[in-house]
Amino acid sequence: MDMAGLKACATTMMILVASIAPGATKSPVADAVMNGDKTALRTLLQQKADVNAPQVDGATALHWAVYRGDVDAVNQLVRAGATIDAANREGVTPLAMASLYGQAAIIEALLDAGGNAKQVTANGETLVMFAARNGNPAAIKLLAGAGVDVNAKERLRGTTALMWAVEQRHAPAVKMLVELGADVGARSGPAGLPRNYMAPRVDTTAVEAAARRHAAAAAAGRTYNEQLEWEAAHGVKISLGFRGTLNADGTPARVDNARRPFGQPAAPAPAPAAAPPPDDAADDADVIVAGLVGAGGGGLTPLIFAAREGDLESAKYLIAGGADVNQTSEYGWTPLLTAANNRHYKLGAYLIEHGADANLANKGGWTPLYLATDNRNIEGGDYPVPKPDMDHLEFITVLLDHGADPDRRARDNTLTRTIFTMQWFYENGATPFVRAAQSSDVELMQLLLDYGADPFIATENGDTALTASAGIGWVEGVTYERSPGDNVDAVRMMLDLGLDPNASNKEGRTALMGAALKGRNEVVQMLVDRGAKLDTRDGGSRDTDNSVSAIAGHRWQAIDYADGLVRVGVQSAITRPETASLIRKMMTDRGLEVPPANRVMESICVVSICQERVWKD
């Protein structure tokens, strides 16, 4: 958050409340400082007015002097007996505000006057963390010199001041913290959403709170909406602090997120029961939350934060301070993987130059090479796509030159996959070559071949680079393709390499079926000319259970895909009349049985179980 944002928060906290109830308390000194009226302040101090009289929200004159950055007013108030560590109703002290604003001169004045540098928030956030977020090295040095532990972790996410500075891209603050002994290898605590937390500033709080609400609703036998209505009627709100223990009626039996004053230590946690019952409600709730939110995230280091933010300068200070360039998060994200995922290729190249392993993969099996390939051919979606700071192909070449294995296989769909694509193309086992082929990225495919890529490696579901390029997994308006011309060239390349035009995946789908669904006549013709069979049948689409398909005759041919009878994944079927005409002609020329044109789904019993066969297998 920048200075304008910080002051906006303070304004909301102090001015708004005061404006709601003017005159609710008598605080002329605070009012004078709030208004910047130096003459009135001088007069009031001469009259021995109470410098500690708070406004309605608890803000004192010293709070306002800090907010305005008025060092002279701070010194005048201190000499007049202002309480240094007075807290407003939010528990915020003047020293905390000065730390958040990075006001080194005011911090020094307050510390000299006896301010408590070791005060912490309810979540364990220290004043050094506040100063790190602002980025003023001088403020950080003053607070650390006053005894604040630079390696303390806040309790909500387990982050340190060094992580806060890196997350805000404050390289000078990072340098100062490293010099003061900050742990460059510290790890954040566990977190939910393990596959998604690498995106900058993902807010998992709302997701987790919703998950715990689902858990509470399930325990009480209510729907989610009924739970919301029940909470509103009973004045209950299940939030992040809710641990899941419920009363018999579904009310939270314990809520541990009550606010306490800034600097006051948290109450000790109650001792755990010696032997919790097997059906403990908290355990049940946590199981539900784990399924809704996820597990295995967290464990981010300062260098991983720097890689996520693309902060090359901070990364340099961290590496110079001894950070391991191959450290991993709980999910297996390395700094290099993180930089590649977020398209911070210059930082990635720097990491490689300093020993980063180009082949380390996370638990999803994603390598820097696979992610860079995916980034170059990103599919359409409702998410922002950052611009890379280096050409994709240039970075990929850097990876390959430093030993990246072009045949390393992914184990899971990448973050960019939408629900549409994942429904009928599974990346488990896909190589960078298969991913490049899916988008007909001929230039990258050739580069990978030049570095020894094996074009014959298929996915665990049996899809080859040929089936992927031809159209298996294609989602209209979503899947990215370099161009229709590149699609023809990619298919030709793979046929020339010797890939089997009749190879099918575990659903029985072939390259010809994919080309028919896409409506690519030139590809269809090329595949048939190279031996692709027109009468091959798949294992049945989502509209017919596989066990019924064999009985009802609903195992589809390429012509059915072109006729728009086959729905794949969650997308609707698409009719390709010109492609259907071409396939019918080729089937007729070869003496194959040709199904009638102008068919619709209901006419061949796709919606309900068929009563009779339409054709023989």
Positions of predicted regions on the chain:
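Ankyrin repeat A-helix N-terminal signature
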Residues: 31-35, 64-70, 97-103, 130-136, ...
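Acidic/polar low-complexity surface segments
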Residues: 186-205, 221-293, 365-366, 371-379, ...
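Ankyrin repeat domain, specifically the short helix-to-loop turn at the C-terminus of the second helix
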Residues: 45-50, 75-83, 108-116, 141-149, ...
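Short, low-complexity intrinsically disordered segments enriched in A/P/G/S/L with frequent Arg
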Residues: 8-9
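Conserved ankyrin/ankyrin-like repeat signature
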Residues: 40, 72-73, 105-106, 138-139, ...
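Ankyrin repeat boundary signal
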Residues: 53-54, 84-87, 117-120, 150-154, ...
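Ankyrin repeat start-site detector
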Residues: 56-57, 89-90, 122-123, 156-157, ...
